[in-house]
């Protein structure tokens, strides 16, 4: 039994490993990959590898994998990538997985500067990429620095502005918050709708020469062939829609395109290498086929896919609405719980205040009672002292009377009697003064006792009011709420007929306008970002593409206006113009 061959296929977000047989064809491997990732819109994609000479090459589906010039290593390395692009992502991409793969590939192209993107658009796209990864901005979850490990905008744009990494993140965070309510899948689609208006989006560029030997670029995309000057990949000069081309062929390095207009000459150019002509031919055939398919009724398979996608989208919207309803209910319960907790805390504080006032009133009452008792004791002592003094005074009066009688009855020495009389008179005066002081003290103590008694009565009334005040209302706890969450040596000449039956006049792509032009919100966001970034821009670091883009903007040109302009005139006139470049 032949030894199996190990193969590794890298998609934009995963690595897949398979073991294939030596006779496995490219289509069998491709089918195995798309089945594994659940992709049905297979016509946009292909398997890319690096050949023995170091050139990126698309795997031929009709040949054995082992018979193609895949670099010999174990495992064999392939990239699963978009080979062809839709004209309008919003109209054509059906499956979410298809949108995601395009989103990741286009984002990588913009961040690596393979697709030129002006600064203001880069920041807006960065915010959609953040919405696509993180969902709605939530300041509780998305703390400062949550974008620290994310590649958000091209390094070129960062180098051209005097802003720190944190300042870039702050700007993108502000715009991230603007996208609140947008589903992750919708954010990816919005990203692509803006990105598809970039001048270099979806274009394969090839170096060519015209008959004069002028170095030019050939751009192959979903709408046709465009010719660019060597120093300007943003602004095509001549365009040929697929509906004007009936045959493409090459002989060695010479490539010939035959227009449908029989009066027009062949469109001839030269590529530097034979393998480039092979790639051009493959891309022309594939893009022309898709161009035709888009202009015909959908096949049964595509109709079924679109119906299924609509049903899935409707189901997601229902689930989203249910989640939003559940989220709002949960937030309402949380708010009610927080409100009740606040009310509980307020009531507890009021209760503590009542208790503190009661304690203070009781202490004040106790202190006043003590003061009243003390005053009463002082009053009694003063009264007793006054009584003693009164008794002494009366005794002195009696003694005086006795002496006066003795003075009358006895004959004594006048001097002795006078001396004794003077002594008793002085003593009586002293006792009289002491009696008056004690009487004043008694009156003062009686007044203070009365004041203390009045304070005691007032305090008892206040305490009675506090103790009889209505208690604070009871605190209700919230109800518990649970939320569940080949080589070409076979020959050097190949030719392909491109049928354009029924679509000769169908060039509605020329009527398109940019997303910014038809979406006022995007237009407003881009204008705001342009104004913000202009203040931090270092004009000395503008690149050649920046200068070209700004000049196009100044002249009012965009991708679709340029497309209309470069297709003006008949086919012969445009071919003559190409030859004259």
UniProtKB/Swiss-Prot annotation:
Detected in eye lens fiber cells (at protein level). The modification N6-acetyllysine is found at residue 60. It holds the Pfam family ERM_C. The modification Phosphotyrosine is found at residues 146, 354, 476. GO terms for molecular function: actin binding; actin filament binding; cell adhesion molecule binding. Phosphorylated by tyrosine-protein kinases. Phosphorylation by ROCK2 suppresses the head-to-tail association of the N-terminal and C-terminal halves resulting in an opened conformation which is capable of actin and membrane-binding. Transmembrane segments: none annotated. PROSITE patterns: FERM_1, FERM_2, FERM_3. Residues 244-581 are annotated as: Interaction with SCYL3. The modification Phosphothreonine is found at residue 562. One of its GO terms (biological process) is actin filament bundle assembly. Residues 302-462 form a coiled coil. Residues 306-341, 534-560 are annotated as: Disordered. Has three main structural domains: an N-terminal FERM domain, a central alpha-helical domain and a C-terminal actin-binding domain. This is Ezrin. It comes from Bos taurus.
